[in-house]
């Protein structure tokens, strides 16, 4: 078996990636989320494939085809709710994975980090298009509002929006192309994940101390395969509790009403995992400014290696920046809450304050805190 594992051209690649891979001996459970994201992607592709067998991407039948899946297809209700809540679990793992990367300074592995940002954009695009497919009220109006943002682009905006719509409004052509993109993107994401891993294995994993761990490595299997398995069991347990006991808790009741272009829902809002970005978008009174802030809210992650001023990599031994980090986490939770609230006092001013705080903490306060810590520890 050892001979095949180390000599066979295909199995050799798997061996070097998941079995004999040298891994730091001290990585914590925060390093489990990579494998959990792989599991989430596999669940989404499998459940999505079975849903696509019964779904029809036509405005007249899309809503009823989803109802048909839930009522008439064997375990269709389970597949549908696994897919819908699987997206939420995917984003929970994504946010924790990115948060870990920021906390422990993993953004200093620039190629891996940038590939991760591209992956984040791809997953967000996929999730947005997936939300449109059931063709409920929030699907239709969410698609209308978000695609309409592109009209803020000077000169080509209106033409671009009509080109994406395939007409003068969100309609049959839009739904068909969104289904096509929603189907193909997860496979593109899978390819990007392999590139993400390729870049990661060039440098090796980071660890909680932020120090070089070349002198103290252990094989990935069996140590981290067992450790990842525990994470998998916990995730699956949480996932099945969510899916089987509270399947609609993260959804919007408006999406159980078929799409009606003549009736606007009182509060148009995206799924919970986009609310922080939606709050930042809404907090700027100018349309183009809002769109730029929306994109920058994610793209700012690409600036993190440039904004790193500390002589230490991780926040493990940096109490001032740690405080800034946890304020940032709290700020993101506030933005998520505000994104789901109506546009009225006091939510407008809270959203604007939280949006300013978000960019200020990342671009100004954390770099300054890093420099202060250098001086305190005399690391200049």
UniProtKB/Swiss-Prot annotation:
CDD domains: cytochrome_b_C (cd00290), Cytochrome_b_N (cd00284). InterPro entries: Cyt_b/b6_C, Cyt_b/b6_C_sf, Cyt_b/b6_N, Cytb/b6-like_sf, Cytochrome_b, Cytochrome_b_C_euk/bac, Cytochrome_b_N_euk/bac, Di-haem_cyt_TM. One of its GO terms (cellular component) is mitochondrial inner membrane. Its cofactor is heme b. Keywords: Electron transport, Heme, Iron, Membrane, Metal-binding, Mitochondrion, Mitochondrion inner membrane, Respiratory chain, Transmembrane, Transmembrane helix, Transport, Ubiquinone. It is found in: Mitochondrion inner membrane. Heme b b566 binds at residues 97, 196. The chain crosses the membrane at residues 33-53, 77-98, 113-133, 178-198, 226-246, 288-308, 320-340, 347-367. Pfam families: Cytochrom_B_C, Cytochrome_B. Binds 2 heme b groups non-covalently. Heme b b562 binds at residues 83, 182. Heme 1 (or BL or b562) is low-potential and absorbs at about 562 nm, and heme 2 (or BH or b566) is high-potential and absorbs at about 566 nm. Component of the ubiquinol-cytochrome c reductase complex (complex III or cytochrome b-c1 complex) that is part of the mitochondrial respiratory chain. The b-c1 complex mediates electron transfer from ubiquinol to cytochrome c. Contributes to the generation of a proton gradient across the mitochondrial membrane that is then used for ATP synthesis. The cytochrome bc1 complex contains 11 subunits: 3 respiratory subunits (MT-CYB, CYC1 and UQCRFS1), 2 core proteins (UQCRC1 and UQCRC2) and 6 low-molecular weight proteins (UQCRH/QCR6, UQCRB/QCR7, UQCRQ/QCR8, UQCR10/QCR9, UQCR11/QCR10 and a cleavage product of UQCRFS1). This cytochrome bc1 complex then forms a dimer. This is Cytochrome b. It comes from Microtus tatricus. The gene is MT-CYB.
């Amino acid at each position: 078996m050892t001979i095949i594992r180390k000599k066979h051209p295909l199995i050799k690649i798997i061996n070097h990636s998941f079995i004999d891979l040298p891994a730091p001996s001290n990585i914590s459970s925060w390093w489990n989320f990579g494998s959990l994201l792989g599991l989430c992607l596999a669940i989404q592709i499998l459940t999505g494939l079975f849903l696509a067998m019964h779904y029809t991407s036509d405005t007249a039948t899309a809503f009823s085809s989803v109802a048909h899946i839930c009522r008439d297809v064997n375990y269709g209700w389970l597949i549908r709710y696994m897919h819908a809540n699987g997206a939420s679990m995917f984003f929970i793992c994504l946010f924790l994975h990115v948060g870990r990367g920021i906390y422990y300074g993993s953004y200093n592995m620039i190629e891996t980090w940038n590939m991760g940002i591209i992956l984040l954009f791809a997953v967000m695009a996929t999730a947005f298009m997936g939300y449109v497919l059931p063709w409920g009220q929030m699907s239709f109006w969410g698609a209308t509002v978000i695609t309409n943002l592109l009209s803020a682009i000077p000169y080509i905006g209106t033409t671009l929006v009509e080109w994406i719509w395939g007409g003068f409004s969100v309609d049959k052509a839009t739904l068909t192309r969104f289904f096509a993109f929603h189907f193909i993107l997860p496979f593109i994401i899978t390819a990007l994940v392999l590139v993400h891993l390729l870049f990661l294995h060039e440098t090796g994993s980071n660890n909680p101390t932020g120090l070089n761990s070349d002198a103290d490595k252990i094989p990935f299997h069996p140590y981290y395969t067992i450790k990842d398995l525990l994470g998998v069991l916990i995730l699956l347990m949480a996932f099945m509790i969510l899916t089987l006991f509270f399947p609609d808790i993260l959804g919007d009741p408006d999406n159980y009403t078929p799409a009606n272009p003549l009736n606007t829902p009182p509060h148009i809002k995206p799924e919970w995992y986009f609310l922080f970005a939606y709050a930042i978008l809404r907090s700027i009174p100018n349309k183009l400014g809002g769109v730029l802030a929306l994109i920058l809210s994610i793209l700012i992650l690409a600036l993190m290696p440039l904004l790193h001023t500390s002589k230490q990599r991780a926040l493990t031994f940096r109490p001032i920046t740690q405080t800034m980090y946890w304020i940032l986490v709290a700020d993101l939770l506030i933005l998520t809450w505000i994104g789901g609230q109506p546009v009225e006092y006091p939510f407008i001013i809270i959203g604007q304050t939280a949006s300013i705080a978000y960019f200020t903490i990342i671009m100004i306060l954390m770099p300054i805190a890093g420099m202060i810590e250098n001086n305190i520890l005399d690391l200049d």
